[in-house]
Amino acid sequence: MADSKKPAIKKPVPKGDRKANRRGAARLAAVQALYQMDIGGAGINETFAEFESHWIGNEVEGDQYLPAEAAFFRDVVSGVVRDQKKLDPLIDDALAKGWPLARIDAILRAVMRAGAYELEHRKDIPARVVVSEYVDVAHAFVEKDETGMVNAVLDQIARQFREDEFTRG
């Protein structure tokens, strides 16, 4: 995504306020925030303030942004920022040879960093759920081939951090 316009969450606000919907919206917002920080150089506090007051749960430029679990959004964004120097080599190792993370589109870097953070630190969420959720987030921004790369990278990282979840029957 070459331009600096923030990708819109174009799903209608769901009926009810299920935790899964709010977490999915938080993941999408976290990826957008990480992308914005990567491209625009905004700081974490400025980004939190902007997203929480102007984007999450609001209508912006005709698009309705879903309500999100703010604590989860903050955890993912702050965790990625804090652990990025550890997460990036994990992602690099999982990428195909000749495709360093620096060569990957900024939105995909944000997706993979957020997914890798959750896989390492959010053991309360099953690994397969994390991988699936971030593949879904990637679908909002990129073509199917690129979502396959996200799936492969996050699956490899999941097996590294949560091998037991893949060896049980």
Swiss-Prot record:
* Keyword Transcription regulation tagged: yes
> What Gene3D superfamilies is this protein classified in?
NusB-like (1.10.940.10)
Enumerate the UniProt keywords alphabetically: RNA-binding, Transcription, Transcription antitermination, Transcription regulation
Provide an example Pfam family for this protein.
Answer: NusB
- Signal peptide start-end: none
Membrane-spanning parts = none
Q: Where is this region: Disordered?
A: 1-23
Spell out the NCBIfam families in the cross-references: nusB
The entry's family comment says: Belongs to the NusB family.
What protein is this chain from?
Transcription antitermination protein NusB
Source species: Rhodopseudomonas palustris (strain HaA2)
Q: From the UniProt record, report the name of the gene that encodes this protein.
A: nusB
